[in-house]
UniProtKB/Swiss-Prot annotation:
Name of the protein: Proteasome subunit beta
Transmembrane segments: none
Species of origin: Paenarthrobacter aurescens (strain TC1)
Protein EC: 3.4.25.1
Means of activity regulation: The formation of the proteasomal ATPase ARC-20S proteasome complex, likely via the docking of the C-termini of ARC into the intersubunit pockets in the alpha-rings, may trigger opening of the gate for substrate entry. Interconversion between the open-gate and close-gate conformations leads to a dynamic regulation of the 20S proteasome proteolysis activity.
Upper lineage: Bacteria, Bacillati, Actinomycetota, Actinomycetes, Micrococcales
C-alpha cells in the first residue's frame, strides 16, 4: 500500500491555496483570464476607501456606492471585509474582480492556518495579497484593475499597521492614514487635517466618516451617508481583540453629528 505522505497529493501540498489552484485548476483563479481584443466591457467599479491608525489599532471604512460610467450601479455594495480575525481588506476598482480576489484571499489565509497550524504574520499576509494583485496585472492592463487597502493588528509589535498597493502588486506601508479610489484625493485632504496621533477609537470613526463625507461632496462616484435610505459607510476596527464591524446605529449618530456641526457653522457642505 502506498504511503500517503509520498503520494501525488502530498508532493503537490502547499500552504498557499492560490498556488494549489495555479497548479491544479488555473481556470478557477479570478485573475487568470485574458479578455478578447476590443472594447473593455462596462462593469461596476467600487470607489472610495479610507484607513487610519489610532491608539491601539487601525480602522478602515468604505462608502456604499458602485458606479458604471455615469450610472450608479449600486447604493448598497460593501467594499470593506474581514480578511481574518486580525486583519481587514478594502477594495477599489473593478468590483466583480475585487470581490473574487477578496474571497480568494480569505481562503488563502484560512488554508495557511490549517496547513501550518499557526497564523501568517501580518507582513506575510500583506505580501500574499500583493502577489495576487500582481497576478491580476494582465487584466489591469486591459482596464480592469483592482487596488486594495490592507490593515491589521500586528500581534508581535502590538500596533495597528496599514498597507497600500499599486496596480503591479507593489506593497507600501502607510504610517498614519491612506485612501484609495476615485474620491481618495478629497478624502486624503480631510484625513490630513483631521487625523492626529493617538486618536481614540470613537474619534477615529468620526474622522473616517467625515473623510468619506468630504469625498462624496466632490466626487460623484462616492456615496455619502444617506439618512433617507438609512445607508451608512461600512467601518471596521482592528485591535488586540480582533476585528469588529461598527454598528450602523453608531454610524448614524456619527454622521448626524457631522451634518449638525456643519449646519451650525453655516457651512455649505
Amino acid at each position: 500500500m502506498q504511503d500517503p505522505s509520498t503520494g501525488p497529493l502530498a508532493t503537490q501540498a502547499t500552504s498557499s491555496f492560490t498556488e494549489h489552484l495555479q497548479r491544479s485548476r488555473p481556470e478557477l483563479l479570478p485573475f487568470n483570464q485574458l479578455l478578447p481584443a476590443g472594447t473593455v466591457p462596462s462593469s461596476p467599479h467600487a470607489t472610495t476607501i479610507v484607513a487610519l491608525t489610532y491608539a491601539g489599532g487601525v480602522l478602515m471604512a468604505g462608502d456604499r456606492r458602485a458606479t458604471m460610467g455615469n450610472i450608479i450601479a449600486s447604493r448598497h455594495i460593501e467594499k470593506v471585509f474581514p480578511a481574518d480575525e486580525y486583519s481587514v481588506l478594502g477594495i477599489a476598482g473593478t468590483a466583480g474582480l475585487a470581490i473574487d480576489i477578496t474571497r480568494l484571499f480569505q481562503v488563502e489565509l484560512e488554508h495557511y492556518e490549517k496547513i501550518e497550524g499557526t497564523l501568517l504574520s501580518l507582513v506575510g499576509k500583506a505580501n500574499r495579497l500583493g502577489a495576487m494583485i500582481r497576478g491580476n496585472l494582465p487584466m489591469a492592463m486591459q482596464g480592469m484593475a483592482v487596488i486594495p487597502l490592507f490593515a491589521g493588528f500586528d500581534q508581535v509589535a502590538g500596533v495597528g499597521r496599514l498597507f497600500s498597493y499599486d496596480v503591479t502588486g507593489g506593497r507600501y506601508e502607510e504610517l498614519e492614514h491612506h485612501s484609495v479610489g476615485s474620491g481618495s484625493v478629497f478624502a486624503r485632504g480631510a484625513l490630513k487635517k483631521l487625523w492626529k496621533p493617538n486618536l481614540s477609537e470613537e474619534d477615529a470613526i468620526s474622522v473616517a466618516v467625515e473623510a468619506l463625507y468630504d469625498a462624496a461632496d466632490d466626487d460623484s462616484a462616492t456615496g455619502g451617508p444617506d439618512p433617507v435610505r438609512q445607508l451608512w459607510p461600512v467601518v471596521y476596527t482592528v485591535n488586540r481583540s480582533g476585528n469588529r464591524r461598527v454598528p450602523e446605529r453608531d454610524l448614524a449618530a456619527v454622521a448626524g453629528a457631522i451634518v449638525e456641526s456643519r449646519a451650525v457653522a453655516g457651512r455649505e457642505a
